[in-house]
């Protein structure tokens, strides 16, 4: 089971990027890395001095997804790669199907959906580094180590 992982600063950067580069109706998606839930649990355990043996694997809850999808196949087909982001412009096509049958649509990308299972997967050290970039986590580590 995988999930995207993004800090608050990265989320703010996405919003600022959208303001600068997006237009009405666009979808903007950051090419965020992901990690498995197990990797996240082990990274937190290591950071907080916990015992990994205490991690319980309870399986998938009813209705829970194995991975998150940020862009579907159709959205990826129209996506514009902007480096660290994808931009999916709003659909401005008209209903003139005759034009489609004459001209076709050869500009469509052939990307598959962008999901947490086919993006960069972080290992335990990378997840720990991302978590340590968060002030809340650093404060929590200090408060726990002072109690011991």
Show where each model-derived region lies.
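Strand-loop microenvironment adjacent to phosphate/nucleotide-handling motifs in alpha/beta enzyme folds
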Residues: 1-148
